[in-house]
Amino acid sequence: MEIAPIPGLSDDVNDIRLRTADIVNAEIIPAEPVLFKGGKEAEPVRAHIRELVKERGLWAPHLPTEYGGMGIGFLAHAYMNEVLAWSPFSARLFGVVAPNSGNQKVLLKYGTEEQKKKWLEPLISGEMESCFSMTEPGNAGSDPRSIQTRAVRDGDEWVINGHKWFTSNARRADFAIVMCRTARETPEAGKPDDTMVQIIVPMDTPGLEIVRSVPVWGHTNGDHCEITYKDVRVPVDNALGRVGSGHQAAQDRLGAGRVFHCMNSIGAMWRAFDMMVRRSMDRDVHGGKLETKQFVQGFIADSYMDIQAARLMTINCARVMDEGGDARTDISAIKVFVPAAFERVVDRAIQVHGALGVSGDTPLAGMYTGARTLRLADGPDEVHRILIAKNVLKHYHSGGSWDFGT
């Protein structure tokens, strides 16, 4: 990965970008075979890189400085992440891995000082892991208002009953943030949902059972778990914010998460592009290099355009968020466009690599399944397309027109 300062970008952000690239190039990418294998051999490598990241002031870019983070905004983070995400291992090594990063943001905004001390600080330091338990097998994941997991107050405790799945990181987690409602009835469409609440539940609480790891893309030993909650009791003080704030807390978490997913996708597709171009230059086929074939030249051109469009859309969305603007339409737009562009770029890179591209000898196969999954995670394409259209039409119905310059 070759990174140069971007003209017009602040010296601070350019410096962050260059220092991030140094660690990814020199430390993480060379260690990928060991990190992929995992086990005891990988742990000292991970520990060394994490300490190096902290020493160089690049730990937890999404968190404020008073909690040990970098305290940078969305725009600076976008420029950093497109470099950081060249390796799938970087996020954890830079302290910004989901779902921990999203849970940290929720705890920062909605947690009490006691909750921050007990749960947030160990989560930031790496002493704890967490998961976010929202999606349910019996309800549409794209409609959080349909959630049926119920929390009933009994004296100074919440009693939780429900069924969740696709709770990522559950087997590693020390605690879950569980999305619940406090009433049986789902509010009518268009009315505020004042029954939703997020509750911190330690994973060793009686009644909480990890039923299984849900197989994803044929992998049966993953960490996307199905969980049942049967008369799970936790203190009332474990609620995050007030009853009724749960839906907004979820939207805060998911909105930022969608942007982070897109930032990560930019870096990954950039690497896939680099691999594709280099492969086309090195590979001999039918009397010439792949790079001389017009089909492959088309792959390169189309991928260049996909990456530039995805990158600039994401940077613009991050700018709007930093400036405090209404970024809802932009968030939905990048959530639809970027994973689809990512999928297209990786698909072309696999095609240029041939059978090697679907093997475990390159990161491309993992990128491909990851890109396809992102078209469902944090809201499917169709929901976000509808939101974009509704926002645009609402603006026009109010007598305005759409200003793409803002």
Question: How would you label these PLM feature ranges?
Answer:
Residues 1-90, 97, 110-115, 122-127, ...:
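Alpha-helical interface subdomain recognition
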Residues 97-104:
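Short, conserved phosphate-binding/catalytic loop or strand-edge motifs used
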Residues 104-110, 133, 185:
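Flexible, glycine-rich active-site loops centered on histidine and acidic residues
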Residues 123, 138-142, 166-169, 188-191, ...:
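Short Gly/Pro-enriched turn/cap motifs at secondary-structure boundaries
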Residues 126-135, 179:
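A short, Trp-centered hydrophobic/proline-enriched beta-strand micro-motif
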Residues 140, 165-171, 219, 256-260, ...:
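Glycine-rich phosphate/pyrophosphate-binding beta-alpha loops
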Residues 146, 204-233:
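Flexible, small-/acidic-enriched active-site or ligand-binding loops
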Residues 148, 156-157, 161-210:
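A short core secondary-structure module
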